[in-house]
Amino acid sequence: AIKVGQIRPVICASPAFLERFGRPQDPKDVMTAPIVMSSASSLLTDWQCNLPAGSITLSPKPRLLVSSNQAAINAARLGWGLTRVLSYQVASRVSAGELDIVLQDFEPPALPIHVVYQNTHRIPAKVRTFVDFLVERLERDEALRPAAKGAT
């Protein structure tokens, strides 16, 4: 396996939403905020946060429950509430200023992304070519690079 990057569960909202409702300062602030939640993954419905004293899991009640992460992202972009998705899913929206990541200092550890293949002494040339192509592409992808805390 070759590590090519990492992703993070992130909480984000539109700048207009944050201006109207305020930027959460503590993970517990999400419990009283409007939430847009995707039912697509349990990783995104139970919100794990890291605190100095240890990890906590929040189960916010959604204002809007949607069936896909893309729908949650679109609703958050339109100001419906905070949502939690994976960092690569919102990287372009964050870069464009359409969404802001909040509570970054409380994020759980990043999840590594690997290219996995059967590593034998005789790897077929087609497989090796594809693996090399994939590794090069994924290692260049900004959305899979670690983010500096407080950078987004």
Protein language model features and the residues they cover:
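Flexible hinge/capping segments at coil-to-helix
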Residues: 1-38
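Alpha-helical segments flanking ligand/cofactor-binding loops in enzyme cores
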Residues: 2, 28, 73-74, 128
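Alpha-helix/helix-capping structural signal
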Residues: 15-16, 70, 88-89
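Secondary-structure junction motif
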Residues: 34-53
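Short beta-strand-to-loop elements that line the ligand-binding cleft
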Residues: 37, 58-68, 106
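A ligand-binding cleft/hinge motif common to bilobed small-molecule-binding domains
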Residues: 73-98
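C-terminal effector-binding regulatory domain of bacterial HTH transcription factors
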Residues: 87-96, 106-152
